[in-house]
C-alpha cells in the first residue's frame, strides 16, 4: 500500500514535501524550479550574479557594461570603488523572476535563494534592492541564506508584501537562529519556515572539516526546533 498523506503547510497553502534548493549562477535553473513547481513542491532559483544569468537567457549586456565601466580596476587588488549598479540589479532581478514565475503551471511555488553576502561595497543598499525587486516581481517566497541576516527583515518591513510573501532562513547554528528570531519577533514577522543545514550540506556553514562525524541532521533539527 502506498501512503501519500504528508503535506507541507506554509501560509495556509499546502505543498508536496519536495523542496529543491537554489544553487547560484543558474546552476539551479528556471527549468528545474518549474519542474518541482509542477509537481506541487517548492523550487528555488538564485539571484547570484543575476545580471550574468540575464545575459545568458535574454542576451542582455549587464556584465559587459559593468566590466567596461570598471576596467581600470581589473588588475587592481583594491576594489573599494567597484559597485553594483542598483538600478540594473533591480531591473535584472525583476526580469529573471518574472520570466520564471510567469511560467508556473502547477500548484507549487517558486522561491528565491537570496544570499546575504552577495554585495559589492554597498551591502545594505544592495541587499534591500535585491529583496524588494524580488517581491515586486511576484516571487512566492524568500529563503534568506549565507549569513546571519540580522537586518534583512528590517530592510523590507515597509514593503507591501512583507506579510504576504513567504519568508524563511537557512540556519546551521542554534545561536544564530535565536538571534534571528529575536529580531523577527521585534518586527512581528516570524519566519514561515526554517531550513536546517548540517556539516554535509556544503556552502556557507559554520562547521569544521571533521564535524560531519559529530553531527547528524535529525539531532540538529531537534535542537533548532527547541529554540522555536
Name every feature range the model reports, one short phrase each.
Residues 1-224:
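Active-site entrance/lid segments in N-terminal catalytic domains of soluble metabolic enzymes
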Residues 227:
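Conserved small/polar residues in nucleotide/adenosyl-binding loops
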